[in-house]
Amino acid sequence: AYTNLLKLVSPEQASRVAFLGFMYPFARQNNFQNQALILTNSDQIEHLESIVSEVPTMHYHIGAITEMSSRLMDLAKYSNVSLYPNITTEQVKRLYQEADFYLDINHQNEILSATRAAFENNLLILAFTNTSHGPDYTAPSNIFSAMNAGQFKQTLKEALGNRDFLSHLLDRQREHAHVATPEDYKKVIG
């Protein structure tokens, strides 16, 4: 809308127009915990088993509002996986409080506006190009080619082991989503 507005006004008017960004209702801060959330109604989750096995220091919470297929239920063999078939609203809320990463790696439709909720809970969102449901909330540098799952896993490992790196990725995520503060508005409006 801002770009379209600039096309409609004179250069003089454009000099008095500023893009302010968006104020989001952030529910919490990221606590730098090794807890990841995946919400899905599909058992088609890009590179899930290799991520779980190659990044074992992360605990993966996988929830679905439906029953889970045997393919997903088989992941219970991993000690770092918790499954939530027929997940309740209360469980979802609790997991958004506990997790600090959201892996947007499920194929098919997004459920429960998951990426927006993850963003508003300050979870770092990582996705693949063929699974990303929330590009407005996911920094482009955090969206990986499915052919480059190794880079996805490396970024996840680095973020787990380096609080400064995780903070940097969260800053890029907020910048991409044009997060503004009340102070930003006061500077422009007065």
Question: Where does each model-flagged region fall?
Answer:
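Acidic donor-binding loop of glycosyltransferase active sites
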Residues: Q97-E110
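Short glycine/proline-enriched, acidic/aromatic patches that form the donor-sugar handling elements
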Residues: V92-K93, E110-L112, N130-Y137
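A charged, aromatic-enriched C-terminal amphipathic alpha-helix characteristic of glycosyltransferases
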Residues: M147, L160-G190
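A short, active-site helix/loop in glycosyltransferases that binds the activated sugar's phosphate group
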Residues: A1-R16
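Short hydrophobic beta-strand element within catalytic cores of glycosyltransferases
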Residues: L124-T129
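Conserved catalytic-core segment of nucleotide-activated headgroup transferases in glycan assembly
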Residues: R16-K77, N86-T89
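Short acidic alpha-helix that forms the nucleotide-activated donor recognition element
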Residues: T88-A99, E120
